[in-house]
Amino acid sequence: MTFKNPFIVRSLTAWAVALLIVAADQVVKYVVKNHFSLFESVEVTPWFHIFFTENTGMAFGMQFMATAFLAVFRVVAIAYFSIVLRRIIHSQLSWGILVCFSLIIAGAVGNLIDNACYGLIYTESLPFGEPAALTAWGEGYGSFLSGRVVDMFYFPFFTWPEQLPWIGGQTFFGAVFNLADAAISVGFVCLLFYHKTILEHHLFRLPTFRKTEAS
């Protein structure tokens, strides 16, 4: 079966990319959540560790608002960027723009799933104890919208020299993040650096409506 309608092809591609990222993000989180104790770390290479941690904040563990408000923010962002993505699909802009918005939406959805559901379906992750386990719906460690986001990717590339002020002895890029965070970051960075003009034109332009005469 072939699709000759460009709108259908672009729509299917955009949402397939988003679905693939969300699925991969959740699979990685499932493996880590079910096999690692909280703060457990496995060194893959000297500069790449799998380090299990959880947070209630935004990407890379940043804390700005309460978990429930953050969930609402994510829902609004997903809805907004989905509308923008639909406009981009119709406008026949480049595939790169389309994929960027798919990545951003997928990342927001991936972390929203943690935020909304993990408190309901997982037991508590404890430091140096037994890994968490799936449980019956509603019997987890928290309530709806109180789930903690699972992070695991840690890249301690190097440590700053001790003699440097403020940053001496600290690890360069000490953030722990997940695949959803990476998708959001890659999507935004590519848009800002490579598609600035198109971003300004399509992301911030308000919709216009044509006036019609009454019959």
Task: Locate each region found by the language model.
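Alpha-helical transmembrane bundles and membrane-interface segments of multipass inner-membrane proteins
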Residues: 1-215
